[in-house]
Amino acid sequence: MSNITDPQMWDFDDLNFTGMPPADEDYSPCMLETETLNKYVVIIAYALVFLLSLLGNSLVMLVILYSRVGRSVTDVYLLNLALADLLFALTLPIWAASKVNGWIFGTFLCKVVSLLKEVNFYSGILLLACISVDRYLAIVHATRTLTQKRHLVKFVCLGCWGLSMNLSLPFFLFRQAYHPNNSSPVCYEVLGNDTAKWRMVLRILPHTFGFIVPLFVMLFCYGFTLRTLFKAHMGQKHRAMRVIFAVVLIFLLCWLPYNLVLLADTLMRTQVIQESCERRNNIGRALDATEILGFLHSCLNPIIYAFIGQNFRHGFLKILAMHGLVSKEFLARHRVTSYTSSSVNVSSNL
């Protein structure tokens, strides 16, 4: 029987967030020169992302849930997106704790937390693509009735969550906690003799559905949306274009580096490019850094999609006015200013 699943072969300190151990029988552990430094830098970064995401996405959900009257289709997407980003962020403290003492939470939590992290990662990215489709339909095909879109949006969101659950099932099925000799306990996949094949599948899934497909959908939809805005004589088209550019640019800046490094790591693990301890350590550090950059996207979503929008600002001020934190006169002045500065409501929910 092959010994590729023998935990003592693996360099457990070299596992990145994806938790995929090497499968080669001649695999030899490498010394990580910056393990302690990297560990605490990652913990601090996780904590900051958690706090910022918790604050921003909670505010977005609060504002949308308060404004039951006149809730738009985009608001439904934003609500689901904020929920996905919030649930994703809630797993970060557990992963941060595992950086200190290893995985001390047992197999059940290993499976559940891994599933939560993956489901909300996929659903967040897929919902971003759905928002771009919604903006494309609203601006490029403005004849589509609001009633039709409101009826469909619930099923689209359910579809995103369902697809995300299916894409995440391998992590739930195969992950377990293990405490190897002379090393900290870890949460990783046990894939048996098919480790190499399944590793490629588990790498292809986030590459495809977590980056490439959503990116092409956004580029297509926002590309045609920009073309329509250029042709139209709309007072708010320049503002809308700035938001669209911000959406695509932030997505690329956050997730492109991680996907490129993950691709390099996959090529190295499958022996397409030569593997060495120095290269493995460099890629491991790059994965840590670029992964944090990707996680930061969950904090930036509220800023891009909600805080920039005039509807969100007005809804937030309305909640403050209801609790006596701002005057109703100030709220009325803000409403008049928003109305006179946005004769076309095309960008308010972008």
Curated annotation (Swiss-Prot):
Annotated InterPro entries: CCR1-9-like (IPR050119), Chemokine_CXCR1 (IPR001355), Chemokine_CXCR_1/2 (IPR000174), GPCR_Rhodpsn (IPR000276), GPCR_Rhodpsn_7TM (IPR017452)
Annotated organism of origin: Homo sapiens (Human)
Topology feature Extracellular, residues: 1-39, 97-111, 175-199, 265-285
GO cellular component assignments: external side of plasma membrane; plasma membrane; secretory granule membrane
Record key words, sorted: Cell membrane, Chemotaxis, Disulfide bond, G-protein coupled receptor, Glycoprotein, Membrane, Receptor, Transducer, Transmembrane, Transmembrane helix
Subcellular location per the Swiss-Prot or TrEMBL entry: Cell membrane
Annotated S-S bridges: 110-187
Record protein name field: C-X-C chemokine receptor type 1
Family: Belongs to the G-protein coupled receptor 1 family.
SUPFAM superfamilies for the chain: Family A G protein-coupled receptor-like
GO terms (BP aspect): calcium-mediated signaling; cell surface receptor signaling pathway; dendritic cell chemotaxis; G protein-coupled receptor signaling pathway; immune response; neutrophil chemotaxis; positive regulation of cytosolic calcium ion concentration; receptor internalization
UniProt KW Cell wall biogenesis/degradation keyword: no
Its membrane topology: Multi-pass membrane protein
Main location: membrane
Functional summary from the UniProt entry: Receptor to interleukin-8, which is a powerful neutrophils chemotactic factor. Binding of IL-8 to the receptor causes activation of neutrophils. This response is mediated via a G-protein that activates a phosphatidylinositol-calcium second messenger system.
Pfam family membership, one: 7tm_1
